[in-house]
UniProtKB/Swiss-Prot annotation:
A GO term, aspect molecular function: transmembrane signaling receptor activity
Cytoplasmic side: 225-232, 285-300
Protein name: Cys-loop ligand-gated ion channel
Record organism: Dickeya chrysanthemi
Transmembrane domains' residue ranges: 204-224, 233-253, 264-284, 301-321
Record SUPFAM superfamilies: Neurotransmitter-gated ion-channel transmembrane pore, Nicotinic receptor ligand binding domain-like
Keyword Ion transport part of the UniProt annotation: yes
Recorded family membership: Belongs to the ligand-gated ion channel (TC 1.A.9) family.
UniProt KW Nucleotide-binding keyword: no
Record's bilayer topology term: Multi-pass membrane protein
Disulfide bond entries: none
Spans within the Periplasmic topological domain: 1-203, 254-263
Keyword annotations from UniProtKB, A to Z: Cell inner membrane, Cell membrane, Ion channel, Ion transport, Ligand-gated ion channel, Membrane, Receptor, Transmembrane, Transmembrane helix, Transport
InterPro entries in the record: Neur_chan_lig-bd, Neur_chan_lig-bd_sf, Neur_channel, Neuro-gated_channel_TM_sf, Neuro_actylchol_rec
Length: 321
């Protein structure tokens, strides 16, 4: 380790294991999620004397005393954590051959950019990014990463199904450190990605079904005889869809793209607006003395079939992509 052997210019190899105990509190609006787990880091420094030549266990506040006496323990931090993570119990195991095993429990709220284009049929990744706070990749390198997710594999947490975890070790350059540490501004980083699939059941019953009923009600204008009743019904339901859009906007952050639910709402706007144009056109032809009941009769079938086809395409695309 750098503190144990300053003459050794080689970086210290640190292997890391992360055990995910629980993922919960997924906040779609703020794009955050809470992770409860354990981190185990292992590296090798100089051989040391231990009582009885057996591993020595040091816990919690005693660790600071060993660090103050010269024991090298790198500060590892999750860089995508929101605020300060709660680190519970900590433990060091010191071996006579120089090996050090650091074990700590952590609980924190993490953030990651999420893609909601297929919402509520979307898939997301819960990401953990770990870096050394002070040591660049010429001093410390992550050599291995193992992730254990047995407690959450194929389980439903909140509205998510956990699928699998993948890991990646990379070097990250921080250009703002170039003036302070020339050629020493690259840091080793561990990235853990946990794949999750949203369970859309809640949104199907609470959002998509009511929207479908509102739009289906708008087709009743093709069975009404009075022109004024047709217009009044259409405009009332158009305002209902507008209010529905405001309601659904509170479940997601402001996005520069449309989601599946947005596209369904847009299809609803289009359906009601097209119905308004058609009943006005039919009324105009009737005022001109041209009776055209066939147009209205065709709309009774064309509108439900057209919207059903659009809805099926959106749902199937969201499920299969």
């Amino acid at each position: 380790a750098p503190a144990d052997n300053a003459a050794d210019a080689r970086p210290v190899d640190v292997s890391v294991s992360i055990f995910i105990n629980k993922i919960y509190g997924v906040n779609t609006l703020e794009q955050t999620y809470k992770v409860d787990g354990y981190i185990v880091a292992q590296w090798t420094g100089k051989p040391r004397k231990t009582p009885g030549d057996k591993p020595l266990i040091v816990e919690n506040t005693q660790i600071e005393r060993w660090i103050n006496n010269g024991l090298w323990v790198p500060a590892l931090e999750f860089i995508n954590v929101v605020g300060s993570p709660d680190t519970g119990n900590k433990r060091l195991m010191l071996f006579p051959d120089g090996r050090v095993i650091y074990n700590a429990r952590f609980l924190g709220s993490f953030s990651n950019d999420m893609d909601f284009r297929l919402f509520p049929f979307d898939r997301q990744q819960f990401v953990l990014e770990l870096e050394p706070f002070s040591y660049n990749n010429q001093q410390l390198r992550f050599s291995d990463i193992q992730v254990y997710t047995e407690n959450i594999d194929n389980e439903e947490i909140d509205e998510w199904w956990i699928r699998k975890a993948s890991t990646h070790i990379s070097d990250i350059r921080y250009d703002h450190l170039s003036s302070v540490q020339p050629n020493q501004n690259e840091f080793s980083r561990i990235t853990v990605r946990i794949d999750a699939v949203r369970n859309p059941s809640y949104y199907l019953w609470s959002f998509i079904l009511p929207l479908g009923l509102i739009i289906a009600a708008s087709w009743s204008v093709f069975w009404l005889e009075s022109f004024s009743e047709r217009l009044q019904t259409s405009f009332t339901l158009m305002l209902t869809v507008v209010a529905y859009a405001f309601y659904t906007s509170n479940i997601l952050p402001r996005l520069p793209y449309t989601t599946v639910i947005d596209q369904m709402i847009i299809a609803g706007y289009g359906s009601i607006f097209a119905a308004i144009l058609l009943i006005i056109f039919a009324h105009h032809r009737q005022a001109m003395g041209v009776e055209d009941d066939l147009l209205i009769q065709r709309c009774r079938l064309a509108f439900p079939l057209g919207f059903l086809a659009i809805g099926c395409v959106l749902v199937i695309r969201g499920i299969t992509l």
